[in-house]
Amino acid sequence: MGTLSEASQVKSNEASAQDFEREPVPAHMRKKWLSMSLVWIAIGIDLSAMFLGAELGNGMNLSDSLTATVIGSVILGLIGALCAFVGAKTGLSTAMISRFLFGNVGARIVSIVLGIFSLGWFGVQVGFFASNMHTAFDKLVGVDLPLGLLSFIGGLLMMSTAIWGYRSIERLSVWSVPLLVIFIGIAVFTAFKTKGTAAIWQPISASPIPMGTAISLVIGIFIVGTVLSPDIGRWARTPMHAVTAAFIGFFVGNSFMTVIAIFLSRLMDTDDLTNIFIALGLGLPAIIVLTLAQWTTNTNNLYSASLGFSVVFQRVPKKLITIIAGILATLLAVFGIYDKFLSFLNVITSFVSPIGGLYTAEYLLVNRAKFTFEGIDRNKNWIIRSLIVWVVATLFAYMTTPAPDGFGLFQLTRVPALDAFIFAFIVQWIVGKLLSKKEEQKG
């Protein structure tokens, strides 16, 4: 009896250690919506949202900046819920879902793109972390730490949880979100106590930001995360758990830090969040917030990259893929990819956003029946129509992106990434309905 019990325990431990990167997450391993929403909230609480909120606070009056944040976050929540629904129904990662869209070989190209861009974004965010941590240490203790060293330390820290997969990220999020809320709450309370409420109603001190531009900034900063939401959504106990967790996670996660930064920037009359914390006498909380905010967000970037590369390198263990990818991305940060922040953001959103429109249209409106793991190896090597729509939608994003980063030919929603998502969704629906039956007959 003891031997059987031990064997059962070993199997249970082995199952709990798996991340199911190339197969559906089993039903008995799936999670409830609350813990999943904390993961998405933790991802949304990052330095990018903090600095966006500070920019909005300085460029808009209080009511307009809050309105833009709420509208943008609702749109993100809806897109994230839609994409997470597909992840929960299939139990598969974004990269694995792409096999139904692009074919078994075509999906490898898409997975390489997802992996490379996620790695690059990991490097950018590590650089972001290093730059702000450098400022914090310089102001607090007068120590001028090299950016390369801070990037290296930050990269290894953020890699540590991604190596162990979703459940490690979940534990980090469950512990870090309450801590972040407490320390950020202390900062807001201290700022109001020090400055009073009159400051938040003061006229703007920078060039005004139009409402449309503000909404586009709120959406653009997080839309790639919504496209990759099946990576988390596949762990949901039911599709409704995924939809609920994604909407709450993206709405609260994206808006929380932005709204906090709006208030702090108006109270303190500066858009430098690191200096705001230090000016309030909150040096240690500043370091904790900087660390946890980037750690919880950026570990997910590496996690998504490793899931993408797991589809390409199918015989290599995911942990090894994560370690190699994490080291490479950390080196990118050490050598200054952070300096290319805006250019890289434009490229990644143009290429990745259409993929979300493609797989949601294909699953919801074209051919849901083919999204079965049992038949995935019988897929064609190439599904040309989806590859063509992806390329055209990416070009469409560049057409709506203002010069010099894009062609600037016209505007749709003022958010090129959202333009690409909508365009890909509509075109994939139309083309898919026209051609999918012919594909089945030929197959």
Question: Model features per residue range: what roles?
Answer:
Residues 1-63, 209-215, 234-241, 434-443:
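Membrane-interface "cap" regions at the ends of multi-pass membrane proteins
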Residues 111-112, 138-164, 178-188, 210-226, ...:
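Transmembrane alpha-helical segments of multi-pass small-molecule transport proteins
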Residues 130, 149, 153-191, 205, ...:
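Membrane-interface loop-to-helix entry segments
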Residues 358-429, 434, 438-443:
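C-terminal membrane-solvent junction of multi-pass transporters and transport-like membrane proteins
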Residues 55-84, 106-110, 250-251, 419:
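Extracellular loop-to-transmembrane helix junctions
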Residues 33-49, 189-194, 203-264, 278-299, ...:
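Hydrophobic, membrane-embedded alpha-helices of multi-pass small-molecule transporters
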Residues 162, 178-204, 218-222, 261-266, ...:
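Hydrophobic alpha-helical segments and their helix-loop junctions in multi-pass secondary transporters
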Residues 107-141, 295-311:
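Hydrophobic transmembrane alpha-helices that form the core helical bundles
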